[in-house]
Structure formats: C-alpha cells, structure tokens
C-alpha cells in the first residue's frame, strides 16, 4: 500500500485507465468476432461493414496507446485477408 499522497492518486488513476483499456480491448475482440461470423455466413456486404468497424477500433486503439502499431498492422492485414477470401 502506498503511503505517499501522489502515489495513492496515481494508483487510482492507473486502475481507472486499466479498466478503460480492458473494456476497449473487449469491444475490439467483439468486433473481430462479428467479422469472423459474417465471413462464416458468407455475407460479403456485412463482412465489409464489420471489417470497417474493426479497423476503426484498431486505429483508435493505436492512437490511444492501447495497441502497438505492429499489432494493429498485423490484425488489419489478417482481417482483410479473411474478408477477401469470400
């Protein structure tokens, strides 16, 4: 347990950011599952719409510092390949 006032405040801030980051990552994973489900159903229009949303989530995550740029590039590429396989 921290004794210094500023560290106590930092711990609270860190916990809030951690919860926000976990929530964001969860929403990204849900978006990926939606793309995979649309591809499995062979619905190209829906898959493209879901792909756009997933790319948006990845880009926003990179801008916020939640995702590394290589992670974003790798995942965007993999999702695009998946949708283009239709």
From Swiss-Prot:
<dbReference type="GO" id="GO:0003735">
    <property type="term" value="F:structural constituent of ribosome"/>
</dbReference>
<keyword id="KW-0689">Ribosomal protein</keyword>
<comment type="similarity">
    <text>Belongs to the bacterial ribosomal protein bS20 family.</text>
</comment>
<dbReference type="InterPro" id="IPR002583">
    <property type="entry name" value="Ribosomal_bS20"/>
</dbReference>
<dbReference type="GO" id="GO:0005829">
    <property type="term" value="C:cytosol"/>
</dbReference>
<comment type="function">
    <text>Binds directly to 16S ribosomal RNA.</text>
</comment>
<dbReference type="GO" id="GO:0070181">
    <property type="term" value="F:small ribosomal subunit rRNA binding"/>
</dbReference>
<feature type="compositionally biased region" description="Polar residues">
    <location>
        <begin position="1"/>
        <end position="11"/>
    </location>
</feature>
<dbReference type="GO" id="GO:0015935">
    <property type="term" value="C:small ribosomal subunit"/>
</dbReference>
<protein>
    <recommendedName>
        <fullName>Small ribosomal subunit protein bS20</fullName>
    </recommendedName>
</protein>
<dbReference type="GO" id="GO:0006412">
    <property type="term" value="P:translation"/>
</dbReference>
<keyword id="KW-0687">Ribonucleoprotein</keyword>
<feature type="region of interest" description="Disordered">
    <location>
        <begin position="1"/>
        <end position="20"/>
    </location>
</feature>
<dbReference type="Pfam" id="PF01649">
    <property type="entry name" value="Ribosomal_S20p"/>
</dbReference>
<dbReference type="InterPro" id="IPR036510">
    <property type="entry name" value="Ribosomal_bS20_sf"/>
</dbReference>
<keyword id="KW-0694">RNA-binding</keyword>
<keyword id="KW-0699">rRNA-binding</keyword>
């Amino acid at each position: 347990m921290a004794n210094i006032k500023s560290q106590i405040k930092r711990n609270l801030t860190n916990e809030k950011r951690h919860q926000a980051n976990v929530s964001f990552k969860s929403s990204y994973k849900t978006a990926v599952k939606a793309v995979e489900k649309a591809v499995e159903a062979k619905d190209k229009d829906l898959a493209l719409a879901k792909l756009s949303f997933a790319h948006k989530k990845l880009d926003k995550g990179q801008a916020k510092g939640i995702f590394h740029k290589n992670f974003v590039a790798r995942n965007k590429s993999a999702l695009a390949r998946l949708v283009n396989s239709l």
